[in-house]
């Protein structure tokens, strides 16, 4: 514990918690302070001016990060027949129909992302209480209920990240690893931020992006000037 506390304290040296950093400087500082013995995940959090308790202020979507996430993603596909074969050929890790529903209902979830063909949704709908709280329920709005099984599987494994605003108006995601070069991390952050901005709901009033922060798994969070994150 003492070693961990010492590392955390050292990682905070040279960081001003009150300063609003430009994205480039923030990414550089976060990378420099990601000194754990594992490849830390770099995360971005955006505080939005929305109240997700209202349906017209919900923010959700999916973005394909240009440089991937750096993590291996296990994908499950609910499909039958030719579409099940297509899913396997595309690289899905788990494929099935009724039997897969039973396995998931039994509490075994050996995957990170879930895709379903439209005809499977009456069955998959039974898994709402299991998959919903984990943010894994297939949804056509984010491309996980689709007949394009190949495209969905490849997107999921290639860097697709789903996002959904939480109760406090915060949306966050892991957008890469500390081992990524700074430019790749910046590109991923900009892609994520642009997707969140484009997903601005009709009910959002006033300042939409209030605060942005970037951090690593074990490092301090740095405040980022929202004006520096747009890819435009």
From Swiss-Prot:
Q: Which PROSITE patterns match?
A: RIBOSOMAL_L1
What the entry lists under Pfam families is as follows: Ribosomal_L1
- The signal peptide stretch is none
Which keywords accompany this UniProt record? Repressor, Ribonucleoprotein, Ribosomal protein, RNA-binding, rRNA-binding, Translation regulation, tRNA-binding
Q: Which residues form a coiled coil?
A: none
* Gene Ontology molecular function terms on file: rRNA binding; structural constituent of ribosome; tRNA binding
Listed GO cellular component terms? cytosolic large ribosomal subunit
A Gene Ontology annotation in the biological process aspect, one of them, is: regulation of translation
Q: Which domain of life is it from?
A: Bacteria
Q: How does it assemble?
A: Part of the 50S ribosomal subunit.
Q: What does this protein do?
A: Binds directly to 23S rRNA. The L1 stalk is quite mobile in the ribosome, and is involved in E site tRNA release. Protein L1 is also a translational repressor protein, it controls the translation of the L11 operon by binding to its mRNA.
Report the sequence similarity comment from the record.
Answer: Belongs to the universal ribosomal protein uL1 family.
What protein am I looking at? Large ribosomal subunit protein uL1
The gene for this chain is rplA
């Amino acid at each position: 514990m003492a070693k961990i506390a010492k590392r955390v304290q050292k990682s905070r040296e040279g960081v001003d918690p009150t300063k609003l950093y430009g994205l480039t400087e923030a990414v550089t500082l976060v990378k420099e302070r990601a000194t754990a013995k594992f490849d830390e995940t770099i995360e971005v959090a955006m505080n939005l001016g929305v109240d997700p308790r209202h349906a017209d202020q919900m923010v959700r979507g999916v973005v394909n990060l240009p440089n991937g996430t750096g993590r291996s993603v296990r994908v499950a596909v609910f499909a039958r027949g030719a579409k099940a074969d297509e899913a396997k050929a595309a690289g899905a890790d788990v494929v099935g129909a009724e039997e897969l529903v039973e396995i998931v209902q039994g509490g075994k979830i050996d995957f990170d992302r879930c895709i379903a063909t439209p005809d499977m949704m009456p069955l998959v709908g039974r898994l709402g209480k299991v998959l919903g709280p984990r943010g894994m329920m297939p949804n056509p709005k984010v491309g996980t209920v689709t007949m394009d099984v190949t495209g969905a599987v490849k997107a999921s494994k290639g860097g697709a990240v789903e996002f959904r605003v939480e109760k406090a108006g915060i949306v966050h995601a892991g957008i890469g690893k500390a081992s990524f070069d700074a430019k790749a991390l910046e590109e991923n952050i900009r892609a994520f931020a642009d997707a969140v901005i484009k997903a601005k709901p009709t009910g959002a009033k006033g300042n939409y992006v209030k605060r942005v922060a970037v951090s690593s798994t074990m490092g301090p969070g740095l405040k980022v000037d929202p004006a520096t994150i747009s890819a435009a």
